[in-house]
Amino acid sequence: MKLNEVVPWGRSLAEYRAMFNLSEAELRQRILGCGDGPASFNAEMTERGRSVVSVDPIYQFSADQIRQRVQQTYEPIISQVKQNPDRYVWQTFRDADALGQARLATMEKFLQDYEVGKAAGRYLAQSLPNLAIAHPPFDQPFELCVCSHLLFLYSDQLSLEFHITAIDQLLQVAQEVRIFPLLQLDCRLSPYLEPVMQDWSDKGLEVEVQTVAYEFQKGGNQMLRIVKD
């Protein structure tokens, strides 16, 4: 991964709770966050004494490098949002500027925690479908894996085979996998959702789409749950 190809954009614990329908009991579980990037989910959960391990290839870079990239990409991202306001639901955030300020605060919370968390093994520079599943922390099963803004969202860039292989790997290390959102970047439903659901249903797993209490990308208010017996 090259840092100049990354667009860091982090989300908060409150957003994770809404995106993934996370109950208080579920927040006490051992959780794997896949594709967390500069989200403050891990930092906020750690403050509460909870257990989260985040994996993302961006963690190969230092806090200063990530902060610099955030500064480089912030204005282009907000400009793009302002050019396409009809793609979004302006309820949680008043407008693009309010969105931007919330994102900056979230990413700064992540950055303040990052180096300490990385040293503690909470931030791992790994990527799907090549997790080091034979080694800690993956040698002990996670109760829940949440995958935010990666699978399905980038269906134009990531193949169906990639999705199947990646989800298979997540299910090797977690009892349950939740994926949000189910839309692509253009706000259309991913064409991979149906074959992915069919694949895991045929394998005897519990598979369902759930509506969640979060919608920013218009129509993006559903997650996929896959649960092992």
Q: Where are the predicted features?
A:
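A conserved beta-strand element that flanks and buttresses the S-adenosyl-L-methionine
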Residues: 146-147, 178
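Conserved beta-strand signature within the Rossmann-like core of class I S-adenosyl-L-methionine
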Residues: 166-183
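A short, conserved alpha-helix within the catalytic core of class I
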Residues: 154-169
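Class I SAM-dependent methyltransferase Rossmann-like catalytic core
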Residues: 1-30, 40-48, 60-71, 76
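Class I S-adenosyl-L-methionine-dependent methyltransferase module
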Residues: 47, 51-125
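A short acidic, Gly/Pro-enriched loop at the edge of an enzyme's catalytic core
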Residues: 129-146
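Class I S-adenosyl-L-methionine
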Residues: 185-229
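Residues lining the SAM
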Residues: 148-152
